[in-house]
């Protein structure tokens, strides 16, 4: 497990890239998470995909207006669970989902064994953003990437979404770390909160600075920067993180909503304004 593989797409730069025509008019409704279902079918013509996208994407699910896309190799169950994850995460703040859609955000899931650069938005990452030491983006970002304004795709992988034993983010005890959820948390930050709630992000920065000053997440990924503090906190909020005691450079003993409330009440309070309490991330029912 190499935590740096989870780095957010926020670090990619500002090169121009496509944005889907996601214009849509609908009425949001307050549904219980148990009411959410996602059907997988062919990509509708109304998405106006460009040639590269048309060549790759062949499967589609609708997360209340946000396209969830995959290619020929992805299992439909992976798109279904990714779609349901989005619906579950965003049930409290569908205004943020609406802004993400208005900003052209889509979600994508690669098939088992595919590299992240199979996704059209990421196909040039090795050329545009070469990594040190000869690493490739397929190795570095094995679990997915968050959406940016330049590359508005929030992604994950089939093996992580469906908790395959081959998933590099699965603990030996069989508890899977939900990287799709982690990256979508980054996407909510950059594709919605940055536009609609800059004061919230100022509060988040203050909470992070206080956490660092008090060594709350020393020797963990959450300590690296405010973006990872947020995404790691969201994972714990949804009970979809790993734990380590003592800290191992990636995690510490905090990996649940209850533990977050005790150890970092400021972050817990902030997250409670964005995400619901009636949804948990992680493996779908029947996962290996």
Q: Where do the model's predicted regions map?
A:
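Acidic, Ser/Thr/Gly/Pro-rich low-complexity segments and short DxT(G/T)-type signature motifs
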Residues: 3-32
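A general structural signal for short secondary-structure junctions and capping/turn motifs
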Residues: 18, 59, 97-101, 220-223
């Amino acid at each position: 497990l190499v935590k740096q593989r989870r780095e957010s797409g926020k670090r990619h730069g500002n090169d121009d890239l496509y944005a889907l025509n996601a214009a849509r008019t609908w009425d949001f409704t307050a549904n219980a998470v148990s009411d959410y279902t996602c059907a997988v079918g062919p990509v509708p013509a109304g998405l106006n995909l460009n040639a590269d996208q048309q060549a790759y994407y062949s499967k589609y699910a609708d997360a209340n207006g946000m396209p969830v896309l995959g290619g020929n190799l992805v299992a439909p169950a992976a798109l279904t669970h990714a779609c349901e994850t989005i619906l579950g995460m965003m049930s409290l703040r569908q205004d943020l989902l609406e802004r993400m859609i208005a900003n052209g955000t889509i979600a994508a899931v690669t098939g088992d064994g595919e590299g992240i650069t199979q996704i059209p938005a990421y196909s040039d990452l090795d050329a545009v953003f070469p990594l040190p030491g000869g690493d490739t983006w397929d190795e570095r970002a094995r679990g997915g990437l968050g959406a940016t304004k330049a590359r508005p795709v929030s992604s994950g992988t089939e093996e992580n979404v469906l908790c395959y034993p081959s998933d590099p983010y699965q603990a030996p005890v069989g508890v899977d770390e939900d990287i799709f959820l982690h990256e979508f948390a980054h996407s909510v930050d950059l594709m919605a909160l940055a536009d609609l709630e800059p004061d919230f992000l100022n509060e988040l920065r203050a909470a992070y600075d206080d956490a660092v000053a008090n060594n709350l997440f020393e020797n963990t990924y959450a300590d690296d920067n405010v973006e990872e503090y947020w995404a790691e906190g969201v994972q714990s909020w949804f009970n979809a993180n790993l734990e380590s005691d003592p800290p191992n450079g990636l995690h510490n003993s905090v990996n649940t909503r209850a533990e977050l409330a005790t150890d970092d009440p400021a972050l817990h309070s902030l997250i409670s304004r964005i995400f619901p309490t009636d949804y948990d991330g992680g493996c779908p029912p029947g996962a290996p």
